[in-house]
Amino acid sequence: MYILVWKEGQQIKTFQDLEECGQFQIASNITDGQIFSVSVTPTMSKGGETGETQLRRLMYLSASTEPEKCNAEYLADMAHVATLRNKQIGVSGFLLYSSPFFFQVIEGTDEDLDFLFAKISSDPRHERCIVLANGPCTGRMYGEWHMKDSHIDNITKHPAIKTILFQIARSFSSMWSYLPKNAANMLLLGKNPNKQAPEPMSVVVTFIYLVEFSSILAHPGLTEQCADILAAFVDACVRNVEGTGGQVAKFITGICMAYWPINRAEDALVGLQQLSEDLAELRSQQPPGSALSLIYSRCGVHYGRALLCNAGFRKADFTLLGDCINTASRITSLSVKLKVPLLLSFEVRCLLGDEMREELESAGLHKVKGRDKPVQVYQFNAPELDSAVVRTKIEQFNPGRYRALCPVKPYDSLHPAQRPPIFDDTPRDSQPKVNQMQRRDSLVDRLSMIAKLAFPSSMMVGGESQLITLTYISQAAHPMSRLDLSSIQRVSFSRNESSNITGSLLYVNGLFVQTLEGPKSAVVSLYLKIRQDKRHKDVVAVFMAPIEERVYGSPLDMTAATEEMLATFPPLQDVLSQLAKSFISLETYVPSTVVRYLTAGNNPRNLQPVSVEVVMLATDICSFTPLSERCSLTEVWTICNTFIDACTSAICNEGGEVIKLIGDCVTAYFPPTAADNAVHACQEIVSFCAQLRDAFRDVLDCRSVVACGVGLDFGQVIMAQCGSLGMTEFVVAGEVSARVMEVEALTREAGRAIVITEPVADRLSPKLRDTGIVPCQEGVDGVPCYGILGVEWELDVAIIKKNIYGFHEARAQAALKKVDDGTNAPGRGAPAAGVPSSPKARALGRTSSVSSYTPDLNETLDPRMAESVFNDLCNQRGDAPNNSIAAKLRQAANDDRLDLGRMLQGPHELMPVLQAIKQLTNLRMLNMSDNFVDDNNVGELAESCIPMRSLQVLDLSNNPGLTKVIALKRLIKHNTQIREILLNGTRIAPMEQRKLQSSMNVNRMCASTDSKSSHKYDH
């Protein structure tokens, strides 16, 4: 249990989990709150009484490669060998088999488990080992078993247990390839991706464009081959990005976003060049009529600070956020104008070695969208890549009689039972729409309004009396006693009997597993009620299908897995509980279409590529670049997370499907007959932003200036899954995908928050079409556009930018005021005239020149005060102190080294850090690499380093904002002990760097001469 205390203990609220507590704190803007964890440690199971420490427990799932052999004798032989081996290395655990899956838990030390799991993973008797849990444990739960084995048939004949084990394991294994790589890596480490805190990191980011893909989509003769083109593009990107140490973040309609760590910049460029060569080789090998001969790529590369985080709640994306992501996208767009296949920023050039730098050619300074300052870019000496030439080649292309490997078929031409479930046909209660002024929902309520139910179209063709089965899992909102379970059984038995429903309900350690059988209308109605039942949370359907006859004869077969089954095999509840929790986590990252197809009992690899007409939606935050430039990375994550949750809520409530979450941008689609629903979703999104601004109007919160624009367009898209190298993407691509982004951008010029194209307007209801839209002066690609009429739907970009700059200025003034208030508080004497104030009272910014530096005789510097100074300055700014930095400062008080490389989350933390390290007069080495140091604040850094009379090494590497050396020259002049200043990855000219080193060498020689002279006089 977690307790949130705020207003100096006057208000207290309890929560069941930390995530719920954090959401409430953020939504309520509680800045002075403290979270306390209250828990009771249970007694260790038998085997944990030995006093062993540093133990770890690992649970994994795998699929048998020879399920026909896996009987009780086979498992017994396997367990006998494992027991002998595990006994020697001190590993305990159990093995459970439920055809065709193995579930195994092993316990031991880190070294033993790493060795054993490496051998297990390479065992040919199973495949696809997926870690379900991996973490430290206080003792052994299965200490008496070096390897306990059991076949599910030896534990129970209960069909519910077998059903849930098979269905969840099958779905879990199938969804694995659709996961973002970062989320998959988290799971392999035994971590829940949607529980991970945002992690700041320095990355080399690229956007890889499939050149003129929109022209390919617009070519009527190439529609059938689009799936083949996307599959080849995905495989080529994955192979070259991951082969050079990078990670693919996501695919976005013919665009690949990828990143590399800071030390793999050269590898990144090599991989991107190899990608271009691979596609050239692929083009040369194609027969006449193959559209693969039209694949070209272009890339833009940038380096900067980003936040690796989980964005979104109900539909999530584990991705990168930050200003450098937007800049990388702009550089790729600039490469189209410059006609080059690979373009990189100056920041990336700074990370390269001398040999690769010599291969680069300057492409000049260019203004890009969203940035006030021009960007310096570079290119390799490579053949020109002109999009106009590629477009002409595509337009003149004749596929002839060539047939695609994965042909795309029209959606309407398929039999209803064969159509993939690309639309959410969930029955919804009709609720009256209310306008913005009538809404009184809290922020938490608005973020949680998400309805999702997986009904495949194959089940919609049957009548209401069709016999179906539905299995779902959920977590109990609170622990269930025997009395609670008896009450549920009594009420449910009578209700199910009257509705002609049979089934079973299994309760396992806080987890409900229920199977319902009966007429479709009755089962659907009951399931909808269960989703609203406050005794459940995280309700997810795992299997649905028509059936010929019932499996269960009773209206409710109630089973608590704490009785006879667990007496036979107690670890069963651990397997079920962990498997269900992992499935719930995965479901948020996988496309809804794939989840619905899986839930119906199908293999997602059999999804038919289709072409279909849809209403496409795109939305993003207005003026996000100026808003995010002066916000911390955590604040950027908060803004995006709040906005994404609101968008997914509104879209799903209106029957839409979220396609991609791209930073602050959300794309989605609606059925062609749901234009009104799409407009209503747009109105909900815009209304939410207005409510957000009102909610935080009186506080300096970054969400108080959030506004958005939304665009709607209509057209044909292709839906297909692509990829075969361990990563699968469900792609929604079409000419309308690119055009809708232009429609959304038109909202700024039109002054309307919602802009729709004429094809969408033609599909609106007469009332909305005739009275609710107004023509825009401009269109997109010759298509007329309309804005939604109403004062609440107006958008003034000038006012939005004014509010953003005003917010940044107000926050800066508030920070200065807090500093002044802290200095002149009652009980403190005001500083005498001409005497500088303490570091805490100094305004955050450069206040004096290093050239005229004189020690302040009234200033006491104490290394033990560094952490306190940092925390105080952060609190005065209204920011939460970075615990990692505070710990480093605390450690440096008793050490002569301080390594803060890549530790800062944003420029807002730099000034408190500089004031704090001034206290550390004992330092010999200071690492400030990759920490937002630039020409505007290097003077403050130099002033902080002057009192460090023992300082010998200062590392300022990978700070591309550094271009001038005047402050560093003054530092060397006043602190002659400095022997080395590392400036790799900065924009300081090599000649200036050599001059600095010469000055330090002179200081060293002078010090040596003084030392020798004093030695002679001493004699």
UniProtKB/Swiss-Prot annotation:
A Pfam family this chain is assigned to: Guanylate_cyc
Top-level taxon: Eukaryota
Gene3D superfamilies for this protein: 3.30.70.100, Nucleotide cyclase, Ribonuclease Inhibitor
GO molecular function (one): photoreceptor activity
An example Gene Ontology biological process: cAMP biosynthetic process
Keywords of this entry: ATP-binding, cAMP biosynthesis, Cell projection, Chromophore, Cilium, FAD, Flagellum, Flavoprotein, Lyase, Nucleotide-binding, Photoreceptor protein, Receptor, Repeat, Sensory transduction
Biased composition, class Polar residues, residue ranges: 846-857
Biased composition range(s): Low complexity: 822-839
Enzyme Commission no: 4.6.1.1
Reaction equation(s) it catalyzes: ATP = 3',5'-cyclic AMP + diphosphate
Domain Guanylate cyclase: 204-332, 615-744
BLUF domain location: 55-148, 467-559
Subcellular location: Cell projection, Cilium, Flagellum
Subunit structure, interactors included: Heterotetramer of two alpha and two beta subunits.
UniProt similarity note: Belongs to the adenylyl cyclase class-4/guanylyl cyclase family.
Function in brief: Acts as a photoreceptor for the step-up photophobic response.
The protein's name in its UniProt record: Photoactivated adenylate cyclase subunit alpha
Organism: Euglena longa
Name of the coding gene: pacA
